[in-house]
Amino acid sequence: MDEKKITMNVRNDELSEESKTLISSLPSDKNSTGVNVCKYQGCWYTPPILQGVLNFQKNFKPQDTDIIVASFPKCGTTWLKALTFALVRRSKHPSHDDHHPLLSDNPHVLSPSLEMYLYLCSENPDLTKFSSSSRLFSTHMPSHTLQEGLKGSTCKIVYMSRNVKDTLVSYWHFFCKKQTDDNIISSVEDTFEMFCRGVNFFGPFWDHVLSYWRGSLEDPNHVLFMKFEEMKEEPREQIKRLAEFLGCLFTKEEEESGLVDEIIDLCSLRNLSSLEINKTGKLHSTGRENKTFFRKGEVGDWKNYLTPEMENKIDMIIQEKLQNSGLKF
């Protein structure tokens, strides 16, 4: 399958009859951008992406060596994909290699989405091109929906979480503004209200994050729960934690040679956003410009957008939803 020749623009009229029948029976709504969404297994999807989810659940053949990068949208997905790729492929692609794949491809190409690319473009895609030793995929599906497609596999799942307020603001910039001319599709206030209702792509946020949090507590060898804020604060400790989980620990020689810092620098948002492929390139699967995947990547940027009243409202929602879970941001 050629990433550069496949389009993700599946229209509603191209849905299978099975998908149409199911969708007609599901709760439906419109998100803040006016897009129709339907609720499946507690999560909101556009109809085409739901078809990708259904195809994945039905036809994916997992391998125990698979690695899946999971996240709610706009929680540091691009960063985590780059780090994971650099870690598990470092024997083949040293971080100092002038021809490292991260220098010529966007991380979303190197870790393709199961439901938004592979199984959206094909009911049963050919996955033979992926490395048999450790195939690398990604998803925005909640844990219980993903697990249905994994069929009991013990593959590794790495989940990146983020403070809800920074997630919301990043979500608004990505989905609700046309990046080329800053045309507002939906105001931050409208996006905020829909977010609080949970009616947003792959939402509700709190159900999504809790599904992986609980999964990491139940089976820590299967699910690693990471936090964007901790990655920013202590990148060396967190990347070593990630390497240990993935079974590719840094050797003493690698640490002494500075490899950990090399990978951190290679995968930094500063470096990735400066690359020509990410300044002028596009994802051929969607047509979206690569530069839209990089904004600030900061902690606390929400303070520039949310009022004290909005802050208080969403904090109260999160406090209620995460109550007694042990999860805090």
Swiss-Prot record:
GO cellular component terms, A-Z: cytoplasm
SUPFAM superfamilies the UniProt entry points to: P-loop containing nucleoside triphosphate hydrolases (SSF52540)
Annotated catalytic residues: H140 (proton acceptor)
Assigned keywords, A-Z: Cytoplasm, Transferase
Domain of life of the organism encoding this protein: Eukaryota
EC number: 2.8.2.-
Entry coiled-coil feature ranges: none
Enzyme class: transferase
One GO MF term attached to the UniProt entry: sulfotransferase activity
Location(s) in or outside the cell: Cytoplasm
Positions bound to 3'-phosphoadenylyl sulfate: K74, C75, G76, T77, T78, W79, R162, S170, R295, K296, G297
Major location (coarse): cytoplasm
Family: Belongs to the sulfotransferase 1 family.
Function per UniProt: Sulfotransferase that utilizes 3'-phospho-5'-adenylyl sulfate (PAPS) as sulfonate donor.
PANTHER family the record matches: SULFOTRANSFERASE SULT (PTHR11783)
Protein name, entry field: Cytosolic sulfotransferase 6
Classification lineage: Eukaryota, Viridiplantae, Streptophyta, Embryophyta, Tracheophyta
